[in-house]
Amino acid sequence: MASSMISSPAVTTVNRAGAGMVAPFTGLKSMAGLPTRKTNNDITSIASNGGRVQCMQVWPPVGKKKFETLSYLPDLDDAQLAKEVEYLLRKGWIPCLEFELEHGFVYREHNRSLGYYDGRYWTMWKLPMFGCTDASQVLKELQEAKTAYPNGFIRIIGFDNVRQVQCISFIAYKPPSF
């Protein structure tokens, strides 16, 4: 007896729409339902400082050179210097004094690139004050430096020896002519 098999292609569609299924992406939706308003990018309609212009001042570039941190403020007195030094000691930084006899302000001599590194080098006053725990020790060294170089610029630096970076630097003394 002969047996015969007949195969016919059968196409079936399985629709498993369960509760956790996400609907398929059908394209971008119309923006007709969303509010569309063209925004005005002109900020002059929002802000007005016309009344404040009278009390604004311009930094005078003549006779007012830019130095380091805090250079735009009036000179620091001994109590304010002591607070700055106490701050850098609290942070665990090592105080160091540097002085410059000719150019205390930014100028270009050895380097033509922009930025903080402007090619000027200051002379270190003695050695960094490793192990210093009292601000009066730093102020005593500052007085010695002022006595030795009354016409020089003197700055105090806070150096982080772990990260090996200078963390703070400010002018502690300027010559009387400045």
From Swiss-Prot:
<protein>
    <recommendedName>
        <fullName>Ribulose bisphosphate carboxylase small subunit, chloroplastic 2</fullName>
    </recommendedName>
</protein>
<dbReference type="GO" id="GO:0019253">
    <property type="term" value="P:reductive pentose-phosphate cycle"/>
</dbReference>
<keyword id="KW-0934">Plastid</keyword>
<dbReference type="InterPro" id="IPR024680">
    <property type="entry name" value="RuBisCO_ssu_N"/>
</dbReference>
<dbReference type="InterPro" id="IPR024681">
    <property type="entry name" value="RuBisCO_ssu"/>
</dbReference>
<comment type="function">
    <text>RuBisCO catalyzes two reactions: the carboxylation of D-ribulose 1,5-bisphosphate, the primary event in carbon dioxide fixation, as well as the oxidative fragmentation of the pentose substrate. Both reactions occur simultaneously and in competition at the same active site. Although the small subunit is not catalytic it is essential for maximal activity.</text>
</comment>
<dbReference type="InterPro" id="IPR000894">
    <property type="entry name" value="RuBisCO_ssu_dom"/>
</dbReference>
<keyword id="KW-0809">Transit peptide</keyword>
<keyword id="KW-0150">Chloroplast</keyword>
<keyword id="KW-0602">Photosynthesis</keyword>
<keyword id="KW-0120">Carbon dioxide fixation</keyword>
<keyword id="KW-0113">Calvin cycle</keyword>
<keyword id="KW-0601">Photorespiration</keyword>
<comment type="subunit">
    <text>Heterohexadecamer of 8 large and 8 small subunits.</text>
</comment>
<dbReference type="Pfam" id="PF00101">
    <property type="entry name" value="RuBisCO_small"/>
</dbReference>
<feature type="transit peptide" description="Chloroplast">
    <location>
        <begin position="1"/>
        <end position="54"/>
    </location>
</feature>
<dbReference type="InterPro" id="IPR036385">
    <property type="entry name" value="RuBisCO_ssu_sf"/>
</dbReference>
<dbReference type="GO" id="GO:0009507">
    <property type="term" value="C:chloroplast"/>
</dbReference>
<dbReference type="Pfam" id="PF12338">
    <property type="entry name" value="RbcS"/>
</dbReference>
<comment type="similarity">
    <text>Belongs to the RuBisCO small chain family.</text>
</comment>
<dbReference type="GO" id="GO:0016984">
    <property type="term" value="F:ribulose-bisphosphate carboxylase activity"/>
</dbReference>
<dbReference type="GO" id="GO:0009853">
    <property type="term" value="P:photorespiration"/>
</dbReference>
